[in-house]
Amino acid sequence: MRTFIIKANKAHTKADFKLKDLPGTSGRIDLLCRVLNSAFLLSHGFRKNVRVWLSLYGPPNPPKAIRFEGQGMKPKTLNPDELSTAKLIIKALKVGENLREPSKEIQVLPGIYVSNLTFEDIIRRTLKGATLYYLHEEGRPIERVNFSQNVAFVLGDHEGLTPEDEAFLSGIAEKVSIGRKSYLASHVVAYVNIFLDSITPPP
């Protein structure tokens, strides 16, 4: 199983943005849509062995967590275009509007869940079943890492993780790198998937 956890510090936690202007009104929900597509979609297929957590910390009601489970999702739920993916996020945010309990998850659609879990909650839950890595330019080259069958990767949005987030990850997540340059989050996820596909047996 492969898990991708992306912390989006400005992504809106309410469906109050415009689909026609995702970059300008949503806190970069468009970036999260591209991450989801890179995580799950193949040219003629769908990755069932992937889980994605979107950890949203933008206005007005942070945090919100949206979990996408490849094993539970119907392949046709996720399409290549950003707008239809953004509509899934909007649906999840609307379903989660009245959530009060911090640990309760509500199913939005098969394989898609929304909650008020914090970034730290997600990390702690993930650590119970996977080895955790922090994708960072200054990390160990990914080619030199021996990966287990259950792996999880943490990455930030266009602004990266906060110093507090990095301090929390210190000691529990090894830094790994796909290169010394800063790449788009969706490209990083695509690269990691392709690299893991080449391992025998792949996670």
Swiss-Prot record:
SUPFAM superfamilies recorded:
alpha/beta knot
Annotated residues for binding of S-adenosyl-L-methionine:
L135, G156
Spell out the GO cellular component terms annotated for this protein, sorted alphabetically and separated by semicolons.
cytoplasm
Main location, first listed in the record: cytoplasm
Look up the domain of life of the source. Archaea
Among CDD domains, the record links this protein to: TrmY-like (cd18087)
GO molecular function terms attached to this record: S-adenosylmethionine-dependent methyltransferase activity; tRNA methyltransferase activity
Q: Where in the cell is it found?
A: Cytoplasm
Q: Which Pfam families match?
A: Methyltrn_RNA_2
User: Which EC class does it fall in?
Assistant: transferase
Reactions listed under catalytic activity: pseudouridine(54) in tRNA + S-adenosyl-L-methionine = N(1)-methylpseudouridine(54) in tRNA + S-adenosyl-L-homocysteine + H(+)
A Gene Ontology biological process noted in the UniProt record is: tRNA methylation
Q: Which controlled-vocabulary keywords does the entry list?
A: Cytoplasm, Methyltransferase, S-adenosyl-L-methionine, Transferase, tRNA processing
According to its UniProt record, the EC number is: 2.1.1.257
Q: Which PANTHER family match?
A: TRNA (PSEUDOURIDINE(54)-N(1))-METHYLTRANSFERASE (PTHR40703:SF1)
The role this protein plays is:
Specifically catalyzes the N1-methylation of pseudouridine at position 54 (Psi54) in tRNAs.
Alphabetized NCBIfam families for the sequence: PRK02135.1 (NF002560)
Q: What is this protein called?
A: tRNA (pseudouridine(54)-N(1))-methyltransferase
- Species per Swiss-Prot/TrEMBL record: Thermococcus onnurineus (strain NA1)
Gene transcribed to yield this protein: trmY
